[in-house]
Design a protein with these regions (language model features):
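Active-site helix-to-loop segments that bind/position phosphate- or nucleotide-bearing substrates
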Residues: 1-142, 148-150, 156-174, 196
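A short, conserved structural fragment
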Residues: 31, 284-295
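Short, cationic low-complexity segments
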Residues: 73-78, 235-256, 322
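Short amphipathic alpha-helical interaction segments
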Residues: 118-119, 269-282
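Glycine-rich/acidic phosphate-handling loop/turn and adjacent ATP-lid/helix
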Residues: 153-188, 229-246
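Long, low-complexity, charged/polar intrinsically disordered regions in eukaryotic proteins
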Residues: 181, 187-235
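Short acidic, hydrophobic short linear motifs in intrinsically disordered regions
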Residues: 253-266
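Short, cationic-aromatic polyanion-contact patches
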Residues: 294-319
């Protein structure tokens, strides 16, 4: 076990006494003492701080695999890395590898050349941490995988989500690996429960990127992040999905969707508010949002995610009964 990384991540000094380390790791449920006074590394200890996951029978196929392709298809694989360290001790290496393999956009500012990652760091970090934590460890022969293309990044983990994928942003979290989740949260590798997806969507909206795509495929979960591209190239279904995720984020933040918030989401000028109204009409037709009130013209209407209508109606009924 890479015990040094535990102390580095917890910002504690490494004890000089080996028994202090052993007792601390036993309290963390990373190791367990045998009757003969020797020690076993438990699955949690190996997953978090193992030097090589392939050294264990049960976790040998669980290292994070990162593949870089040239172009937008899988025909030309340019590089592949398999990072075998435990997820806590090896997370920084995983992120460094992803950043190195991610395509860059070149910009000039004040005569200086600057390279910026095509995919924002916060969503990438959160999605990779989620894939490591929420994977199904009973699924044999497959582990978390990160595929990087010129125009997108796909993060896949074995195991279907435990909550409805349409409610990732708003539903109370559920984890099939609670001990690992708690440990990685405490070590600062992932967000507190329930706010990871908020941060992902908030960052995506801030940069006016296409909405991430969430898919459940053959008992695996795949999330796709897209590089920036003009609004005119987004399909109607992509715009509808972006509006739905925007509505979920607004709901979590205690507010509603409006023409103004949609203009901000897509970078639409105020004089083109009719375009935002058309996008909202498409989302209404698709059934992903509903009107929050019946007052005001199209420009001033407020909208909620489709599933929020029932709770709104119940609140209004309760108020009228009172």
């Amino acid at each position: 076990m890479n015990y040094e990384s535990y102390y580095a991540l917890t910002k504690m000094t490494v004890p000089q006494d080996a028994m202090v380390i052993l007792n601390q790791f036993e309290n963390e449920q990373l190791i367990q003492q045998r009757d003969d006074q020797s020690w076993d590394i438990l699955n949690l200890g190996a997953l978090a701080f193992g030097r090589n996951l392939e050294d264990t029978d049960t976790l040998g196929r669980k290292p994070a695999r990162i593949v870089r392709y040239s172009g937008s298809g899988r025909w030309h694989q340019s590089e592949e890395e398999e990072l075998k360290a435990g997820y806590a001790s090896g997370f920084a290496e995983i992120m460094d590898c992803v950043r190195r393999l991610t395509p860059k956009n070149e910009t000039f500012n004040g005569g200086f050349r600057k390279q910026e990652s095509r995919f924002p760091d916060v969503p990438v970090r959160e999605l990779i941490a989620n894939a490591l934590i929420h994977q199904d460890f009973t699924a044999r022969g497959v582990g978390p995988m990160i595929e990087i293309f010129d125009d997108r990044m796909e993060v896949l983990n074995p195991g279907a989500p435990l909550i409805d994928a349409r409610l990732f942003i708003t539903a109370p979290p559920k984890s099939r690996n609670e001990a690992l989740s708690k440990l990685l949260r405490r070590l600062g590798i992932c967000e507190e429960q329930g706010i990871g997806w908020d941060r992902i969507v908030q960052e995506i909206e801030l940069l006016q990127l296409p909405a991430p795509r969430i898919e459940v495929i053959h008992d695996s979960t795949r999330i796709t992040l897209y590089a920036a591209r003009p609004l005119s190239t987004m399909s109607p279904s992509e715009r509808v999905e972006a509006i739905y995720q925007h509505a979920c984020l607004q709901y979590v933040n205690g507010t509603t969707v409006t023409n103004a918030s949609i203009r901000k989401r897509f970078g639409i000028h105020q004089r083109n508010s009719a375009k935002a109204s058309r996008f909202l009409a498409d989302a209404l037709t698709a059934g992903v949002i509903v009107t929050a009130d019946s007052n005001g013209g199209r420009k001033f209407k407020k909208y909620l995610p489709y599933w929020a209508q029932d709770s709104t109606d119940q609140n209004m009924t309760a108020q009228s009964d009172a």
